């Protein structure tokens, strides 16, 4: 189980990302349309003034149950340990153990 502070930090980053998403898209669109260097400079300063944690690259996927940051499956949002346990307990519909 990951530390609760790490899980809370990740949730806070997710909220900030959603809050500033439209502003960030608008500024990036204006940046690509701008032709003057001074105008691009002003827009880039506005982009840099946004909170650092609102950038989508600062997010990490975490397991929904344990908070583990490594070995996550995007389709389920679970780490490999939890995925295996839940699949063996038949808690994931449509997931079967392969055999050949």
From Swiss-Prot:
Family: Belongs to the universal ribosomal protein uS14 family.
SUPFAM superfamilies documented for this protein: Glucocorticoid receptor-like (DNA-binding domain)
BP GO annotations: translation
Role noted for this protein: Binds 16S rRNA, required for the assembly of 30S particles.
The keyword DNA repair belongs to this UniProt entry's keyword annotation: no
Protein name according to UniProt: Small ribosomal subunit protein uS14c
Main location: plastid
Gene Ontology CC annotation, any one: small ribosomal subunit
UniProt-listed Gene3D superfamilies: 1.10.287.1480
InterPro entries: Ribosomal_uS14 (IPR001209), Ribosomal_uS14_bac/plastid (IPR023036), Ribosomal_uS14_CS (IPR018271)
Any matching Pfam family: Ribosomal_S14
Assembly behavior: Part of the 30S ribosomal subunit.
Domain of life: Eukaryota
Gene Ontology MF terms: rRNA binding; structural constituent of ribosome
HAMAP family: Ribosomal_uS14_1 (MF_00537)
Compartments where located: Plastid, Chloroplast
């Amino acid at each position: 189980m990951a530390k609760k502070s790490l899980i809370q930090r990740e949730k806070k980053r997710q909220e900030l990302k959603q809050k500033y998403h439209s502003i960030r898209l608008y500024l990036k669109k204006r940046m690509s349309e701008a032709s003057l260097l001074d105008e691009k400079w002003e827009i880039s300063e506005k982009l840099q003034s946004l909170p650092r944690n609102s950038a989508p690259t600062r997010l990490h996927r975490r397991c929904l149950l344990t908070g583990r940051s490594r070995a996550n499956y995007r389709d389920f949002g679970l780490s490999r340990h939890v995925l295996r346990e839940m699949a063996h307990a038949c808690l994931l519909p449509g997931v079967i153990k392969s055999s050949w």
